[in-house]
Amino acid sequence: MTVLAIDPGSEQSAWVLYDGQRVLGHGIIPNDMMLAHARVNYYLPVVIEEIASYGMAVGREVFQTVRWAAKFEQAVLEQRRITGVGAVYYLPRRDVKLHLCQSARAKDANVRQALLDRFGGEKAAKGNKAAPGPLHGLGKDEWQ
C-alpha cells in the first residue's frame, strides 16, 4: 500500500511517498505547494504528523504548523466527498519513536538510525546514484 506521509511545518513541509518497500518520491516544499500535492494525491492514505506540546509552551510557529496540517487534511477530505476515496490519519511523533526505537525519548538521530537498520544499514538503505537504495536521497525532515 502506498502512503503519502507529511511532516507539516509553519512555512514548508516535508513529504514522502512510500510503497511499503521503498521511497517513491520525497521533498521539502512550500506549504501552498504541499496543499496542491495533497489535493492531487487524495486517493492515497495520507498520514500527517500530529503536533503535540507535552506541556511545553508553544509559540506562533507551532500554531501556524497546526493550521497547515488542518488545511492538508481538509484538502484530502474535500476530494473524498467528491470521489468517495481518500483517508487522513494523524500520527504522533511519540508513537513513531516508540515503534522504531522502543523509547519515547529517542532523538532524530535514533529514528534515522532505526530506519537505516531496518533497511540493511546505511550503505544498503541509501545506496548511491548508480544503484539507489530504498531510502536513497532522503534528508532533513524527510526521515521523520
What are these regions (language model features)?
Residues M1-Q144:
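Phosphate- and other anionic-substrate recognition elements at nucleic-acid/protein interfaces
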